[in-house]
Amino acid sequence: MDMVTLGSTGITVNKNGFGALPIQRISQEDAVYLARKAYRAGIRFFDTARAYTDSEVKLGEAFDGIRTEVYIATKTAAQNAEDFWKDLHTSLTNLRTDYIDLYQFHNPAFCPKPGDGSGLYEAMQEAKAKGMIRHIGITNHRLAVAHEAIDSGLYETLQFPFSYISGEQELELVNKCKGANMGFIAMKGLSGGLITNSAAAYAFEAQYDGVLPIWGVQREKELDEFLSYIDNPPRMTGEIKAVIDHDRTELCGEFCRGCGYCMPCPAGIEINNCARMSLLLRRSPSAEHLSPEGQAKMKKIEGCLHCNQCKAKCPYGLDTPALLARNYEDYKRVLAGEVKV
């Protein structure tokens, strides 16, 4: 069993974290079942957020009565101290607990610090002093904010996208966190569904002893894959390296990671899927994307307002309207039978 310690927090768990964003899409009963199954199999770290609709509520029911046996991380996207306290109290109620193991600022556009005028970090400190939270973390998709958080010495963990199609810049963050004794939580280990070989994804993350990957789980078969890696962790074999090299070649350049931070779109476009449809058609079962419902979603691209809000919000600096246009043209060719997927 691979184990990881999250820096100075002392939180030590097996190298399989449960990402609870997807369980907002399934029933309470199914979500509770998955979370409890994960716990029984040995997963101890569960990551959610106030922004993930009813995800916290579902975890709260799942761990009622066994709270001290799991580590729960959640997040606030508050922009001021007043909203911070509202989020924290709501999360505590939803999770049926009086403390949160790791409380994280959720993808802020800046790095909260004492005296910056927002009151956010001071609120974190007060919550920790009161025992409402035990450790302070930050999540982000922006390299500059991530570096500032590490350099500040104010945070115990950083959560950032990291997968085998990441570049040298992300690897630099991993090494920098290790040098600062700061835990690194890897989100997007499957790159929003573009990586389809979970064994290769796990083997890559396992190379870095200070990294805890959290896997977004919505279906039991997905959970079962990662549970199998607890006792039989995949290693970097020649076969797995070949898979990684192939994907790195295919997924190089500009592509949408599906993070959703450009949403909502004023034209109603489901950008986080539509802007990467060409890849989804070729790397996942295409029937759902080509269904009448899928076609209706893609057709909304025709109503793009060219307001460039999505482009301005993209943490990866992508030209999102141009990506949407290219993906829509390819989609229409696939529908017309001009291109096979």
Model-derived regions: residue spans:
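N-terminal binding-site loop/beta-alpha segment at the start of enzyme catalytic domains
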Residues: 1-70
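Structural motif
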Residues: 37, 41, 94-95, 152-153, ...
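Short catalytic-loop micro-motif centered on adjacent basic/acidic residues
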Residues: 44-49, 73-74, 134-137, 157-160, ...
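Generic structural signal for well-ordered alpha-helices
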Residues: 3, 35, 56, 60, ...
